[in-house]
Amino acid sequence: MGIQGLAKLIADVAPSAIRENDIKSYFGRKVAIDASMSIYQFLIAVRQGGDVLQNEEGETTSHLMGMFYRTIRMMENGIKPVYVFDGKPPQLKSGELAKRSERRAEAEKQLQQAQAAGAETEVEKFTKRLVKVTKQHNDECKHLLSLMGIPYLDAPSEAEASCAALVKAGKVYAAATEDMDCLTFGSPVLMRHLTASEAKKLPIQEFHLSRILQELGLNQEQFVDLCILLGSDYCESIRGIGPKRAVDLIQKHKSIEEIVRRLDPNKYPVPENWLHKEAQQLFLEPEVLDPESVELKWSEPNEEELVRFMCGEKQFSEERIRSGVRRLSKSRQGSTQGRLDDFFKVTGSLSSAKRKEPEPKGAAKKKQRLGPAGKFKRGK
């Protein structure tokens, strides 16, 4: 889910923090991609007649087709992707995961009713609601990436948090995901729609955290409190407080604790056993991989092993897979050229002079808890 309504709120109150770019403008950029979010998109979008792609054994293959061709598209445009996979979800997320299970059970019932009624549109809608990324999907995509020569990382916990850590450490330019909580985890730059279908023709949206904080007049701790008020995966929000009201309250009172102290408890009851402090800590001190231990390497694809896996096991067209490998190899030759801004330091201009970012305080300054360095798999 991410943060409820955050993208629209930023567009309304801090529009200068959002840029829209064509994929070609990211030539030479390294980008950390939320793997689970991408795989979920592929399972939803890569379909034939409303159904996921399958081989003769009935195994789903939509995720592999999506991962193969979208990754090639990025490489052809000079982007160097590194996929980051989720680790163990934090305990705070258990409530949200339970709600998702309930929604899946309800969608299953509605799907059966739609099938009985022969309502094709409804059948497709509820079928997509039942899509879930499994360990097998993840493992197969990791195997595919290793054969393609594309690096991936296993995060100790939430992938978005480790993506944010890689951006903050300068290992990559941006984090790519549809989940806005990547900003709440502190990613300086967030890209949306990078792995979306070409058919949708969506421009890539680029969100800049420093500009968001400047426009709202908040520091990172206060921004985290705003996101908790909007609604996150980790704790309930206060009913009756909408996005604009949440912004007004945090700008005026500076913290959730002060807001709660001043709110009318009858009009705005605080959730029972509210875990907002735990959510604050999770956002400000997430368990992440150690960026300094990460060495990213993009290598030549293993054509014969790719054919064996994608064609022999998963029954894709050999001609198409070999064609894709040729495109991938060609893109590697072109992407060795760097960006001009990697060689020349920008000293500033009148139009883009940055104001000083509000200084974080307290817990925001504490070093993030580092999980295991993240099992790093290098493309062979």
Swiss-Prot record:
Region (Disordered): 349-380
Residue segments, region Interaction with PCNA: 336-344
Residue span of region I-domain: 122-253
Modified positions (Symmetric dimethylarginine) in chain numbering: R19, R100, R104, R192
Matching SUPFAM superfamilies: 5' to 3' exonuclease, C-terminal subdomain, PIN domain-like
Residues reported to bind Mg(2+) 2: D179, D181, D233
Pfam family, any one: XPG_N
Key word Ligase present: no
Positions where Phosphothreonine occurs in the chain: T336
Membrane keyword on record: no
Subcellular location: Nucleus, Nucleolus; Nucleus, Nucleoplasm; Mitochondrion
Location of Phosphoserine modifications: S187, S197, S255, S293, S335
Cofactor-binding details, from the entry: Binds 2 magnesium ions per subunit. They probably participate in the reaction catalyzed by the enzyme. May bind an additional third magnesium ion after substrate binding.
Residues annotated with N6-acetyllysine modification: K80, K354, K375, K377, K380
Cofactors (names): Mg(2+)
Post-translational modification: Acetylated by EP300. Acetylation inhibits both endonuclease and exonuclease activity. Acetylation also reduces DNA-binding activity but does not affect interaction with PCNA or EP300.
Alphabetically ordered keywords of this record: Acetylation, DNA damage, DNA repair, DNA replication, Endonuclease, Exonuclease, Hydrolase, Magnesium, Metal-binding, Methylation, Mitochondrion, Nuclease, Nucleus, Phosphoprotein
MF annotations from Gene Ontology: 5'-3' exonuclease activity; 5'-flap endonuclease activity; DNA binding; magnesium ion binding; manganese ion binding; RNA-DNA hybrid ribonuclease activity
GO biological process: base-excision repair; DNA replication, removal of RNA primer
GO CC field: mitochondrion; nucleolus; nucleoplasm; nucleus
PANTHER family per UniProt: FLAP ENDONUCLEASE 1, FLAP ENDONUCLEASE FAMILY MEMBER
Name assigned to this protein: Flap endonuclease 1
Organism: Ovis aries
